[in-house]
């Protein structure tokens, strides 16, 4: 079995890149030949509102490698990346870890943010940590959302990483019967961390990519995170963040009390960074996630999640069993207070969260992938 993987190669890596690498590695261990194909030439002088079209043309440039790619049994890409190969006879699988339409629906303009969150953005702008309150245009995102829909319609099969992603796709007219929900997995090393002693005093922990532009910052709920951190000035806080915005990182260091930050840490070094916070509280403040690897990663290290209802969270978190799902900042504050005052509850939920994360070992994901491939090639 030969699989052609089509995706982008980025300097600061996102969940999609890590998942692509993990899938390819584990498929090779099962004897599958997997070859990666990356477009090489991106137009650099196009105006901002052409960015979506630019990305689409970027992947069409792979047609120069069409003979090599078409020698594979299956062509798989992330959302619209296999676009150029939809018209050929080879089966195409489009893998959706999230949807751009989901982003667009979840992220309001800054002046419409809830419960004081707008004020956080105004302060960041005033201090120079961010340059603008809203992105100049959503046209590129709308272009990408349209082409994602087109790619999903034309692909032979679509993989969705959660029920939220599946529902996004059904909502734009993709047939439910061609969508296979296959949850993401986390790397094996997340399960190799020795059990740590659970501390009586809890730390508030954030793990994840926060981005640089105002749209991504709102998508990832950085304003919510800052607001929650500021409600607990005396509590220790630790963040592992992926971002190229040095001014924002410095602002978070300087203005959030009792807060330490690790920036752009090497992925396999993160379990060791989190180990001493086992029994602490992990905050997931995003307005939209397709899956949220960082949620599962935090749970695997014995952190108790308090998460908004995004990504995989509503499928795996059970209130007062292994964490809490919340819908407002006030509710999140209430749950944080509950856990801070009740170490016994926090320790019980910590152990349950760690057990829940074991569902997301890579073996389960790869078996489902292989079953889908065999079905396609029957």
Each language-model region and where it sits:
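Nucleotide-activated donor-binding/catalytic signature segment of Leloir-type glycosyltransferases, i.e.
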Residues: 249-281
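Acidic anion/phosphate-binding donor-loop and adjacent secondary structure
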Residues: 170-171, 176-177, 181, 185-202, ...
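Conserved donor-binding/catalytic core segment of Leloir-type glycosyltransferases
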Residues: 197-220, 226-230
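Aromatic "clamp/platform" in nucleotide-sugar-dependent glycosyltransferases that forms part
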Residues: 287
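Conserved acidic donor-binding segment of nucleotide-sugar-dependent glycosyltransferases
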Residues: 319-330, 338-344, 358
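Short hydrophobic beta-strand element within catalytic cores of glycosyltransferases
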Residues: 281-284, 304-307
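A short, well-ordered alpha-helix in the C-terminal region of glycosyltransferases
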Residues: 338, 345-359, 367-371, 375
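Membrane-proximal helix-turn-helix segments that form the acceptor-binding/catalytic region
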Residues: 116-158
């Amino acid at each position: 079995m030969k699989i052609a993987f089509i995706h982008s190669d980025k300097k600061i890596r996102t969940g999609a890149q890590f998942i692509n690498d993990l899938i390819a590695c584990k498929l090779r261990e099962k004897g599958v030949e997997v070859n990666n194909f990356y477009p090489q030439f991106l137009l650099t002088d196009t105006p901002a509102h052409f960015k979506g079209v630019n990305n689409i043309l970027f992947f069409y440039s792979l047609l120069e490698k069409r003979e090599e790619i078409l020698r594979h049994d299956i062509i798989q890409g992330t959302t619209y990346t296999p676009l150029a190969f939809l018209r050929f006879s080879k089966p195409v699988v489009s893998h959706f870890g999230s949807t751009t339409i989901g982003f667009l629906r979840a992220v309001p303009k800054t002046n419409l943010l809830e419960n004081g969150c707008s004020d956080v953005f105004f302060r960041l702008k005033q201090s120079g940590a961010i340059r603008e309150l809203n992105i100049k245009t959503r046209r590129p995102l709308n272009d990408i959302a349209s082409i994602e829909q087109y790619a999903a319609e034309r692909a032979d099969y679509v993989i969705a990483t959660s029920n939220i992603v599946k529902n996004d796709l059904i909502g734009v007219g993709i047939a439910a019967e061609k969508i296979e929900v296959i949850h993401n997995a986390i790397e094996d090393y997340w399960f190799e961390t020795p059990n740590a002693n659970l501390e009586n005093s809890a730390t508030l922990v954030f793990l994840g990519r926060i981005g640089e532009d105002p749209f991504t910052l709102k998508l990832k709920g950085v304003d919510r995170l800052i607001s929650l951190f500021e409600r607990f000035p005396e509590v220790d806080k630790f963040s592992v963040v992926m971002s190229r915005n040095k001014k924002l990182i410095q602002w978070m260091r300087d203005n959030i009390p009792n807060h330490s930050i690790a920036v752009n840490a090497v992925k396999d070094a993160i379990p060791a960074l989190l180990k001493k916070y086992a029994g602490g509280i992990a905050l997931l403040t995003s307005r939209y996630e397709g899956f949220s690897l960082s949620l599962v990663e935090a749970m695997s290290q014995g952190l108790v999640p308090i998460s908004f209802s995004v990504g995989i969270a509503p499928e795996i978190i059970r209130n007062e069993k292994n964490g809490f799902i919340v819908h407002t900042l006030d509710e999140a504050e209430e749950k944080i207070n509950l856990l801070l005052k009740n170490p016994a509850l926090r320790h019980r939920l910590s152990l349950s969260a760690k057990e829940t994360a074991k569902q997301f070992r890579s073996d389960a994901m790869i078996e489902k992938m292989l079953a889908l491939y065999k079905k396609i090639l029957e």
